Each structure stands twice: as C-alpha cells, then as structure tokens.
Regions:
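Conserved alpha/beta catalytic core and glycan-binding cleft of carbohydrate-active enzymes
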Residues: 17-177
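Active-site groove signature of glycoside hydrolases
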Residues: 1-14, 55-56
C-alpha cells in the first residue's frame, strides 16, 4: 500500500500561509492525530502478517518514517526515495558526453541511504509525460536500449528495494496518459 503525500499529513502548516493554521496542543506544527493514525495503521498492517507492506511517499525529511534508528517511528515498511529517482532520471537524460561532472547524482543517495528503509522507485508519477525509453539520452534506438540496460543494472545493484510501474521495465514506449 503506497501512501502519497505523507508530508502534508504530518505538518499542520504544510502548504499554508503563516497565521492560517493552528498549532497543536504543544505549540508545534506536527499533526499529532495524523501521526498517531499512520502509526496505528502501519502497526495493524504489519501485525496481520499476510505479506502486505506500506510505502510512504514523504518528501519533508521527517526522521523515522520506517523503523530505522528511531525510538518512535511511523512504522512504514519503506520510504520511497524520491530524491534518488529525480537525480537518477536527470543523470540518465544527460548526454553521455556531458555526464563527467554529473556522477554525484548517482552517488549522493548513498550519504543518507541507511537512515531509513528506502524503496527505489520508477513509478507512474515519473512517466506521466514520457516513457522511460524516451527519457534516456541517445541518438538512436540502440543507444536508448543500451542506456536502459545500464540504468537497470545500476538500479538493481543499488541498495534498497525496487519498484517499477506501468511496464517501464519492459521498455514500454507509451507514457501514462496514453494508456
């Protein structure tokens, strides 16, 4: 189960102007009810033991989305690594002649990789306007497919669980709005 927009649930002031939101009972901006709801939901799902797991799409940098090194985590099974996805797709879209100064986009994720249980994903949000095969650089189909093979190899060798959506792993040539 993938939960979108977790950051907007966690903060009372998320996307709001100053003075348009009310602090919690401790004076903070954390949404205590939403935090408790997410913890309870995740504990219940984990307790069922039927193989179901939860993925948080959380972009605010909240520490303790998964059970990693936190006394009071939200208990999601995985946190979707959106920063890795953005950097990865930018790198793959860069012409190979100009990638020399761009390798930090591939390695930066390792600086924070072990702070949470991350899931690397290339999901429907990433392919609304272009198919994966059209996002990689290359002058012809052979170059595109070579880049895709290299990209998949890098992704699968990178630590963390993986998630592909919408047939992009099979070289689907249509983007989401055409399906």
């Amino acid at each position: 189960i993938r939960i979108d927009g977790v950051a907007s649930m966690l903060y009372l002031d998320y996307g709001k102007q100053p003075g348009t939101w009310t602090p919690n009972m401790y004076g903070g901006n954390e949404n205590l009810d939403a935090i408790e709801f997410l913890k309870t939901m995740n504990k219940y799902i984990a307790k069922r033991g039927d193989g179901c797991f939860t993925i948080a799409e959380e972009s605010s940098g909240w520490f303790g989305v998964t059970a990693a090194d936190n006394d009071d985590p939200l208990m999601f099974t995985y946190k979707q690594n959106n920063c890795w996805t953005k950097d990865f797709l930018e790198f793959m879209g860069t012409d190979p002649l100009f990638r020399k100064g761009e390798y930090d986009k591939l390695t930066y994720g390792m600086l924070y990789n072990y702070g949470e249980d991350f899931m690397l994903s290339l999901n429907h949000d990433d392919f609304r306007e272009k198919a994966f095969v059209d996002m990689v650089s290359g002058s012809d189909e052979k170059a595109h497919l070579s880049d895709i093979k290299a990209a998949l190899g890098f992704m699968y060798a990178h630590p963390g669980s993986k998630m592909f959506a919408a047939g992009q792993d099979a070289g689907l040539e249509k983007f989401m709005s055409e399906l």
